[in-house]
């Protein structure tokens, strides 16, 4: 029962969540999505694969292959793809995210770029980013970048407080 688990400590909540998610994930191997990308064009290739595949099921295990590389994906290639893909999403040349430097708070965080695309294609990229972020969480993949607290609370639809604003604008 969700009400009962909400009263538990964090460790028990995490165990419950992990157990719950693993029972929800489809583990079929015959029709799992296959992603084929070039390392040099990982963001565009990945976006194109997701946008051209109808009904992409993010609950299924994905198999990833890098073009011109002989490697069997038993998990390592998939995790490397995630790492490289998020690095590409967060690269300033992608115009999606920017680093906010809060030396007074002792950390750098990632927030939506001021020059992020607002057209249909840009919105689709952010939509895909959200799905991949959810997939990364489901698969227990740790991001090397810290998302901004203001952004996280917006994503999970939590109320933004005045204290949260310091993570967006120190002034």
Each model region followed by its residue ranges:
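Long, Ser/Thr/Pro/Gly-rich and/or acidic low-complexity regions in intracellular
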Residues: 1-171
């Amino acid at each position: 029962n969700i009400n009962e688990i909400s009263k538990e400590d964090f460790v028990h909540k995490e165990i419950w969540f992990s157990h719950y998610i693993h029972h929800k994930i489809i583990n079929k191997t015959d029709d799992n999505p296959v992603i084929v990308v070039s390392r040099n064009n990982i963001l565009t290739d990945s976006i194109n694969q997701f946008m051209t595949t109808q009904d992409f099921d993010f609950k299924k295990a994905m198999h990833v292959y890098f073009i011109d590389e002989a490697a069997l994906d038993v998990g390592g290639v998939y995790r490397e793809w995630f790492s490289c893909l998020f690095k590409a999403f967060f690269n300033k040349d992608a115009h999606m995210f920017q680093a906010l430097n809060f030396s007074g708070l002792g950390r750098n965080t990632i927030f939506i770029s001021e020059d992020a695309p607002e057209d249909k294609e840009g919105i689709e990229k952010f939509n895909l980013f959200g799905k991949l972020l959810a997939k990364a969480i489901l698969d227990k993949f740790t991001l090397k970048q810290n998302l901004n607290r203001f952004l996280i609370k917006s994503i999970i639809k939590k109320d933004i407080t005045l204290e949260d604003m310091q993570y967006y604008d120190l002034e």
